[in-house]
A protein has these predicted regions:
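Positively charged n-region of N-terminal signal peptides that target proteins for export
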Residues: 1-7
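Signal peptide processing junction and immediate N-terminal pro/mature segment
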Residues: 20-22
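Extracytosolic secretory-pathway proteins
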Residues: 24-207
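Bacterial N-terminal signal peptides
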Residues: 7-18
Length: 207
């Protein structure tokens, strides 16, 4: 083996090793609040896009670029859910809606703007999960509550404040509850919500 070839191998190993530096896994603790969400949504008769930011992530600090002004313009963690409506059931004043889809959490590049949903996906995806949702809408006052379950299918190492992290592990699950209000028909956004997610089910400590 030539000296040049040996140098190339050492360089390649160094690059590989640096790329495999361990990241701290931010767990999704069972029966504890892992995330808090603030968001809006736009619906069609067959689809729903929900978007916003994470206002609290257990295990992470400084998730806003400005700790005094904590909103969509300074949020470093954002999310977008794209879902299809599978079923609608009417029971008196209640409309029960079932949806499935995908939720992506992003390491965001602020600012985001609720007037432009695409600004909540302008960062780097760091967690992807399958999503199922039940909405219970009170058509009398246009308020609703939801419960949905996310099953994490992909996580990507990211750097925040100079440290490497992974947001959970593949196989983690969390249950989310939202409370919200629907806007008048034809107006944008279709509505507003806030809520939190709690870890459900424990998995082995593996990446």
């Amino acid at each position: 083996m030539t000296r040049f070839s040996s140098c190339l191998m050492v360089l390649a190993l160094s690059v590989f090793t640096s790329g495999q530096m361990p990241a701290q896994v931010i767990s999704i603790p069972e029966d504890q609040v892992a995330y808090e969400f603030v968001g809006q949504f736009n619906n069609t008769p067959t689809t729903s896009q929900q978007f916003g930011y994470i206002s609290t992530a257990k295990g992470l600090s400084s998730i806003f670029t400005d700790n005094t002004t904590q909103n969509e313009t300074t949020a470093l963690l954002t999310f977008v859910t794209n879902a299809n409506t599978d079923r609608v059931i009417v029971n008196g004043p209640f409309k029960i809606i079932n949806r499935t889809g995908t939720t992506t959490i992003y390491l965001n590049t602020p600012p985001s703007d609720f007037g432009d949903a695409s600004t909540f996906s302008q960062g780097t995806p760091i967690q992807v999960s399958d999503y199922s949702q039940q909405v219970i809408l009170n058509t009398g006052n246009n308020t609703f509550v939801t419960v949905h379950t996310n099953n994490v299918t992909q996580v990507t190492t990211f750097t925040l404040n100079g440290k490497a992290y992974r947001l959970g592990r593949v196989g983690n699950k969390f249950r989310t509850n939202y409370s919200g209000e629907v806007n008048a028909p034809g107006l944008s956004p279709s509505g507003w919500f806030a809520g939190n997610a709690v870890g459900v089910g424990a998995i082995a400590n593996s990446n």
